[in-house]
């Protein structure tokens, strides 16, 4: 999955606009997310492992907020021969276009339906697996419960939700410590202080992380029988919930 180097915030801006998943971001997204999200590669690989365990024959798999298709590709490699259908959705035309290019580079018998649209408008049905990989944090907090309700209702019994998110911690010392460790991670991956500061300003109004307790309570309130965090590095985590 090719990507140009992310230098979108390398020069100073008089006014930093709110972050958008536009063509500029889509062109550098693979580099951006791997240099910004600790453990991203492991999360993507493990989503494929989970698909192998939970995808049932003749069912649907949803990648909600698919971006460039990394999770979709990981899933598709692990569910061959099960007559599954993957539905990958993103509201960015630029992401969908590049996702289509990435998917076309690999031959597979598992069909993928690409949808450019709002994940809140998609009806989930006959799903054995639903993936929300760093997507929910960009939705309005008031929309998150209804999305999870839609997912729960559309999952088959025993179906799996994978939810990856940046976390917020109410304990000030913990929040500061983990945030500092994340910033050090970004510095170690070549981001300058200017890039870090400007990107943070860009994301401030569009990304609203929840606490882990808020995630678990919201998930269990929909009826999911089991919940666990399977991965965490600093203030980034991936969770699983079983219907």
Curated annotation (Swiss-Prot):
The keyword S-adenosyl-L-methionine applies. GO terms for biological process: tRNA wobble uridine modification. S-adenosyl-L-methionine binds at residues 40, 65-67, 90-91, 118-119, 133, 200. It comes from the Bacteria. InterPro entries: CmoA (IPR005271), Methyltransf_25 (IPR041698), SAM-dependent_MTases_sf (IPR029063). Disulfide bonds: none annotated. Pfam families: Methyltransf_25. Its EC number is 2.1.3.-. One of its GO terms (molecular function) is carboxyl- or carbamoyltransferase activity. Keywords: S-adenosyl-L-methionine, Transferase. It catalyses: prephenate + S-adenosyl-L-methionine = carboxy-S-adenosyl-L-methionine + 3-phenylpyruvate + H2O. It is an enzyme of class 2 (transferase). The keyword S-adenosyl-L-methionine applies. Catalyzes the conversion of S-adenosyl-L-methionine (SAM) to carboxy-S-adenosyl-L-methionine (Cx-SAM). Belongs to the class I-like SAM-binding methyltransferase superfamily. Cx-SAM synthase family. Homodimer. PANTHER family: CARBOXY-S-ADENOSYL-L-METHIONINE SYNTHASE, TRANS-ACONITATE 2-METHYLTRANSFERASE-RELATED. NCBIfam families: carboxy-S-adenosyl-L-methionine synthase CmoA, PRK15451.1. This is Carboxy-S-adenosyl-L-methionine synthase. It comes from Shewanella pealeana (strain ATCC 700345 / ANG-SQ1).
């Amino acid at each position: 999955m090719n990507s140009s180097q992310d230098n979108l915030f390398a020069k100073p801006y008089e006014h930093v606009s709110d972050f958008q998943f536009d063509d500029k971001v889509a062109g550098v997204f693979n580099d951006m997310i791997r240099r910004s999200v600790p453990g991203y590669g492991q999360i993507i690989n493990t989503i494929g492992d989970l698909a192998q365990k939970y995808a049932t024959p003749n069912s649907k798999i949803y990648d909600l907020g698919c971006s460039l298709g990394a999770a979709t590709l990981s899933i598709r490699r692990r569910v061959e021969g099960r007559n599954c259908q993957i539905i990958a959705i993103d509201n960015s035309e630029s992401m969908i276009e590049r996702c289509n290019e990435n998917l076309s580079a690999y031959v597979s018998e598992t069909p993928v339906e690409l949808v450019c649209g709002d994940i809140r408008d998609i009806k989930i049905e006959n799903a054995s697996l639903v993936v929300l990989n760093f997507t929910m944090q960009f939705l309005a907090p008031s929309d998150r419960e209804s999305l999870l309700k839609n997912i729960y209702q559309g999952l088959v019994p025993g179906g799996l939700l994978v939810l990856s998110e940046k976390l917020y911690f109410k304990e000030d010392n913990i929040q500061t410590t983990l945030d500092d460790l994340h910033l050090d991670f970004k510095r170690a991956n070549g981001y300058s202080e200017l890039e870090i500061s400007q990107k943070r300003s860009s994301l401030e109004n569009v990304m609203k992380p929840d606490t882990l307790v808020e995630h678990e309570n919201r998930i269990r309130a929909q009826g999911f029988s089991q919940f666990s965090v399977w991965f965490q590095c600093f203030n980034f985590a991936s969770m699983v919930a079983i219907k």
